[in-house]
């Protein structure tokens, strides 16, 4: 199955902290709660275009 590399960015400060792989079959954007080093707290991170 093919996978695409995507970047996750913080919804508060918009820094791109994480990268992950995503299936090409999924159409939904990834949203995950992760730790942001810039904000120094756990925030929601969403997939960038």
From Swiss-Prot:
GO terms for biological process: translation. Pfam families: Ribosomal_L33. The keyword Translocase does not apply. One of its GO terms (cellular component) is ribonucleoprotein complex. Keywords: Ribonucleoprotein, Ribosomal protein. GO terms for molecular function: structural constituent of ribosome. Belongs to the bacterial ribosomal protein bL33 family. This is Large ribosomal subunit protein bL33A. The gene is rpmG1.
